[in-house]
């Protein structure tokens, strides 16, 4: 959970409201933890995403790109891998999961921002790689661009056989 998505250039009150919950979920999670970071560069506004969302955010090396302090501390405590990603879905996520778990994971749980962009992209990517692995999204530890788009994303993930918990 990066600063720009919480109270920075693309922040929302809903994002602010889940910071402590995400830290709690990370703290109590018994397994490997991976944090993904949206990562953009100076040419962002000239990219496909930048043309459709012309708001600079998560620019590499900025405070907005960094994980929120509470999340960074928890990532350190849990010895999390922090992955930069340049697309909504982290294309190397399955590879990293298998490195950390020594093979196909027993289950996967996702939390964070934004439910309707990155979380859903990663959930569907992981479901494609691991069709028999239970994939959970903790709705109480996610927030979307809007409350309605959060709900829509949860509904879409259910249709794709992703298990939504704590809704």
What are these regions (language model features)?
Residues 82-121, 143-167:
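Conserved N-terminal glycine/acidic-rich loop preference
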Residues 37, 112, 139:
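Short beta-strand/turn micro-motifs composed of small residues
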Residues 21-28, 120-130:
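Histidine-anchored nucleotide/phosphate-binding helix
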Residues 131-138:
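Short hydrophobic/aromatic-enriched beta-strand-loop microsegments
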């Amino acid at each position: 959970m990066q600063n720009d998505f919480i109270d920075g250039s693309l922040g929302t009150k809903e994002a602010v409201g889940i910071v402590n919950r995400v830290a709690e979920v990370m703290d109590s999670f018994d397994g490997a933890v991976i944090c993904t970071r949206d990562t953009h560069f100076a040419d962002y506004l000239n990219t496909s995403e930048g043309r459709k969302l012309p708001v600079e955010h998560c620019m590499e090396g900025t405070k907005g790109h960094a994980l929120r302090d509470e999340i960074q501390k928890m990532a350190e405590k849990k010895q999390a891998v922090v992955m930069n990603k340049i697309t909504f879905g982290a294309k190397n996520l399955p590879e990293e999961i298998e490195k950390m778990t020594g093979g196909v994971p027993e289950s996967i749980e996702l939390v964070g921002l934004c439910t309707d962009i990155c979380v859903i992209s990663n959930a569907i990517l992981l479901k494609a790689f691991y069709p028999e692995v239970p994939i959970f999204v903790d709705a109480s530890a996610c927030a979307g661009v809007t409350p309605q788009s959060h709900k829509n994303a949860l509904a879409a993930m259910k249709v794709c056989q992703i298990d939504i918990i704590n809704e």
